[in-house]
């Protein structure tokens, strides 16, 4: 036992889509809590990653990438992201080193200027640029607003992420351990199962399809005969043509999705899984409040 005071706090990770927010949180947690992909708007809900050591508990809140919404789902995502400003002690504003500052970033910066908590600028993906360019990138952002710290990292390779944790620890006040030490997230297993299926669809499909799907996990029970966990999940699409793409020729695609997702789910649950998936069409669900709520995008989340 050390006689150091226990520190804790909530840390929101904000930024444009695709800058690496979820990759960073998963790296810190040492496991996949939030799904990741090279497609923008991968994360749709706030997701906590609870990082506990003997000296501290940092509750990271991964958020949907802030963008200009084109439907009710987008509205929900952006609202959830901004709502974390009211519930956190520190903000990590993440940008990508390999992309110039855009109007998207400028919009976020205007909001962050009004934040009542310290904002740390995290320049991610430094593995993608020549080190000489870092100075100019940092100078550009710091000319726009005053940040309490600037930390360049590579979330993918893990460069400098420990320094970022140390910097965060310094910023946090003494506080209670909010969650038991073995709790890693605020979402139930069913949510993580749905997300892992959605991740494989993001990986395997293109254009509008990844954005048009939702996944629900309707049942998770242990099959007494086989001893496996029997999971029944539904993939929701917006159009008949999308259903065709998800099923694939002779069911090829859905089998591939199921196989890849099952592997991840088995690792997460530490158990054998039998995954059964169904595909359902719900026209324009992304603009229907009732459907959004049914598929886990509840307004309650940010009100
Ligand atoms: N080269 C490199 N790629 C990275 C790094 N961090 C993330 N990526 C990649 O960037 C892409 C987006 O990563 P995500 O973690 O899904 O990004 P996000 O900010 O959570 O995106 P949204 O959820 O859409 O807002 C993925 O293809 C990652 O592998 C990094 O440090 N270096
Ligand atoms: Mg994400």
UniProtKB/Swiss-Prot annotation:
The gene is era. Residues 205-283 form the KH type-2 domain. Belongs to the TRAFAC class TrmE-Era-EngA-EngB-Septin-like GTPase superfamily. Era GTPase family. Residues 62-65 are annotated as: G3. Residues 7-174 form the Era-type G domain. GO terms for biological process: ribosomal small subunit assembly. GTP binds at residues 15-22, 62-66, 124-127. Its main location: cytoplasm. This is GTPase Era. Keywords: Cell membrane, Cytoplasm, GTP-binding, Membrane, Nucleotide-binding, Ribosome biogenesis, RNA-binding, rRNA-binding. It is found in: Cytoplasm; Cell membrane. Residues 41-45 are annotated as: G2.
